[in-house]
Amino acid sequence: MSHRDTLFSAPIASLGDWTFDERVAEVFPDMIQRSVPGYSNIISMIGMLAERFVQPNTQVYDLGCSLGAATLSVRRNISHPDCRIIAIDNSPAMVERCRRHIDAYKAPTPVEVIEGDIRDVTIENASLVILNFTIQFLEPGDRQAILNKVYQGLNPGGALVLSEKFSFEDAHVGELLFNMHHDFKRANGYSELEISQKRSMLENVMLTDSVETHKARLRQAGFEHAELWFQCFNFGSLVAVKAGEQA
């Protein structure tokens, strides 16, 4: 059961860096719905993208799966024989709850939930890979390498879904969308104190890139086709397709 996010409703004397610990995992569904505009749309559309791209006898990877929302969306929308979903997260608290969520919804497609570092995972025979608000928590120097690995592990015709919070090269646009995102959080019941304290904890661990930077990395990895398919304020999602025909 998800609880309402009140983690930052009272002043915290010493704010450390953000971690996806048990306290965050417990309120995460409420937190992300109230903090990330368009999150539900992205999750449901990932299921539709899975219908289009997932092939029989292949694997789907959900890298940085948190509580498994994207995995469950994929699973609801595919029924291919000999298909498998591999969901990976480095937070023990998230992995434990993700396994519970997966077990609660029975479906024919098997899911393996792994506690581990996505930088160490071997990707192979993939028809779909999901990086849903994950890259922004990696060290900038590690980001190109994970995209290179995804590209190499995708079958021809396979796709990567890359969702992120964005920064903007145009400072005026960046400020407008930043302020609109804060309006969104206020409208969802977060106080100025909650918004400020969470931002302070995230600022050293969540380092955002522009859409242009993401596209440049995807091109460098080898993706011939990459485009923004969804955006709400300073959050959005790209889809990148590896050239070639699906088997």
Curated annotation (Swiss-Prot):
The reaction(s) this protein catalyses: prephenate + S-adenosyl-L-methionine = carboxy-S-adenosyl-L-methionine + 3-phenylpyruvate + H2O
S-adenosyl-L-methionine found in the keyword field: yes
Transferase listed as a keyword: yes
GO BP terms in the entry: tRNA wobble uridine modification
Matches recorded under InterPro entries: CmoA (IPR005271), Methyltransf_25 (IPR041698), SAM-dependent_MTases_sf (IPR029063)
Main enzyme class: transferase
Coiled-coil regions, chain positions: none
One family name in Pfam for this protein: Methyltransf_25
Key words, A-Z: S-adenosyl-L-methionine, Transferase
Listed SUPFAM superfamilies: S-adenosyl-L-methionine-dependent methyltransferases
EC number: 2.1.3.-
Single GO molecular function: carboxyl- or carbamoyltransferase activity
Residues noted as binding S-adenosyl-L-methionine in the record, renumbered to the chain: 39, 64-66, 89-90, 117-118, 132, 199
Domain of life: Bacteria
Similarity section: Belongs to the class I-like SAM-binding methyltransferase superfamily. Cx-SAM synthase family.
Quaternary data: Homodimer.
Role, per record: Catalyzes the conversion of S-adenosyl-L-methionine (SAM) to carboxy-S-adenosyl-L-methionine (Cx-SAM).
Name used for this protein in its record: Carboxy-S-adenosyl-L-methionine synthase
Organism: Klebsiella pneumoniae subsp. pneumoniae (strain ATCC 700721 / MGH 78578)
Lineage of source species: Bacteria, Pseudomonadati, Pseudomonadota, Gammaproteobacteria, Enterobacterales
